[in-house]
Structure formats: C-alpha cells, structure tokens
Amino acid sequence: MQHFVAVAASLVVPTITGKEATQLILRWFHIIAGITWVGLLYFFNLINVPFMKQVDAGSKPKIFQYLTLPALNWFRWSALATVFFGMWYWGQFLVAPDAQRQGVGQGSTFGLFLLLWIGVWAVLFVIIKKVTPSGYVLGAITAILVYAAGWIFVNYTPVGGDDNHVLAIGVGGGMGIVMLFNVWGIIWPNNKKIIRGTLAGTPPANAAIMARQAFLASRTNFFLSVPLLFYMAASSHFSSTVIFGK
C-alpha cells in the first residue's frame, strides 16, 4: 500500500516518501470519518432528541425512513471507519516504533488496550441493558471505569516511554473503542428494531425501554467525546503532556 499511496501523493507532494504518504492518508481518512461520526453524534444528542419529543406519532414513520435511518447508517459506518483508520495509524506508526526502540513486543500493548477498554464497555453494556439506571448513576460509573482503565493502561503498558503519543491515544482511543461498541452493540440494534417495527406498523412492545437504553448509550458517547477529543489533540500538539502522572 505504501508504494501506491506514494505514487498518488507524488502528484501533489513530489518529495514525500511511502511511509509519510501512508501516515498522511491514514490520518486524513481518520479525521474525515471522525468529523462525520462526532458531528452526527452531536446532531442526535443536541438536535434530534429534543425534536423527536415534539413529533406526533403519525409523523414518525416518515422521519424514521428518510432522516433517522440514513443518519444512523452514516453514523455507524463512520464510527467503524474512524476506529479502523485510527488504530491502524496508532499501531503501525506509534506503538510499533516505540516498542522496537525499547526492545519489547507490541502485542502486549494491544492486548492490554483491548482487554481494558472492551472490559469497560462490557460492564456498561450489562448495566445499560439489564439495569437501565438513571443518567447520573451511569455517568458516575462510566467516569470511574474510564479513569481506572486509563490509569492502568498508562502505568502498565510497556511502551510510551519516549513521549506521550502512545499513551494519549491509548486513553483517548480507548474511549473511542467504548463509543464504537456502544454504537454497534446498543444504539444501532435498538434503533433498528424500533424503526423497522414502526415502519411495519408493529412497533416492539418494549420500544420505550429500548429507546431509553439507546439514549443512555448515546448520551454516554456524547460526554466521552469531550475527553476523547482532548487526548487526540494532546497527542499531536502536546506530546510531552503529563497524563495520569506519567
């Protein structure tokens, strides 16, 4: 792939290397997908949720079909693309070189990263789906879990000794993993069932509960996006920023 993107990039920047071109393309795609994902996340939370409360039942099918469903399709696929390109860039150009310089394997860093952040999501999934708590309780639990996972990653990953690029994205990207799984594990499945049932004239009997669960997952993503964006910016602009005391 590096040779291909190098040729393409040479049309614009003749002196760019294959490695530099790959970095550029991955970050570019990651940013474009991320803007789409977070933009739609803010649309759903700040505009769509209050709007849908004012819509009468007869208007919902058309809104679901021509607005909500297409928006959710862009939302879920842009979420996947954001994480895919971001993890590719992080692993190939940050984790791998740092691991090589320190003489350690990068597998342990990825293993710890996935174990921690998928573990955080699994706990939140059970709480949202089985308990469906108040937003304040869920927010407190989320804050504790995220802080704990971030602290463990920063203090126990074998890489990240050169600067905080690996660590900052390891924390911010970890929140992105939680958000991605919320999208594909709760928000999309619940909304899909509600929308398809409504369009068929037979909405699910537990539609209100499913909507509440999707709302809690979406609102969790909304608040997680704030520190996520901070850590992503810090990784690029403040590579020496102290994170969790390191």
Question: For each predicted feature, which ranges?
Answer:
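Polytopic transmembrane helical bundles with strong interfacial aromatic enrichment
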Residues: 2-246
